[in-house]
Amino acid sequence: MIEAKLWRAGRRKIEVGHVWRPAEPVRGDGAMGTREHAWLARGPKLYRMAMIDDATSRVGARWVESDSTGANLGMLEWWLRRSGRPQSFYTDKASLFRTAEKRRRDEPGVEKGAGEPPPTQIGRALRELNITWIGAHSPQAKGRIERFFQTAEDRLVKGLQAEGVKTLEQAHTYLEQEFLGWWEPTRTVKPASSDDAHRPLDQEHDLTAILSHVETRQVKNHYTLEFERRLYAIERTDMGTGLRGAAVRIEKRREGSLAIRFGEALPALPRA
């Protein structure tokens, strides 16, 4: 009938399934993610933040009340102090990791500007630690961290409900003692290679400074500077050559204190 042109064969649509990214052969690549879910049903709203080693599926996880820059930097610090610096770092393409200008430039057909847009605070910290950031194009590209969340949304939620967990403190206890205690022996695997590509934290890697909120300010003639609508004065005993009119690095630490860095770190800033 086709040859007689009495019937025309239609094109058959072939469904292409998602393919999970294969595991890395050696330890040293991490993936990080945050999942909002009704973890405690009628309890407080919580986010589940986790980081996983791509080769072994070893996990670090915590509850946070917001998916903020500070919370993500805290998760990163935990990983760095436990394992060292990973070679690369998979996340989604949220604004915490990639600026709006960077996202716009990455769109097809958008002309690339002459200069690279400034990184986010997390992007800057990764750059100072010499860790490559990789923005996953899909949940499947993040691999093991997405499968971890799939398991958590089933098994963890059921466990929290069965134990009657209602508070953040109770959720922390159950997560550490029960869920991660089950995950470690049952879900982690041996890597294809015994090598570990993590790199140690060197002397120049001051995590308190690197994992701060960092901005640049110019010192005025009277050795003052403005930050967050406040005026701060630098003590005369801390003044170094060339400080007047210089651009200095302001570090707002995660516990709230401020420090100024001009070559060497200076004491926390007093208000003018």
Named regions from a protein language model:
Residues L80-A114, A136-P139, D196:
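Acidic/histidine-rich, metal-coordinating catalytic segments
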Residues E178-A272:
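C-terminal, beta-rich DNA-binding module of retroviral/retroelements integrases
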Residues E65-S66, D92, D238:
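A generic structural motif
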Residues M1, G33, M51, S57, ...:
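Mobile genetic element proteins and their domesticated derivatives, centered on retroelements
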Residues M1-A38, R104-P117, D196-L207:
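Basic, flexible linker segments flanking DNA-binding modules
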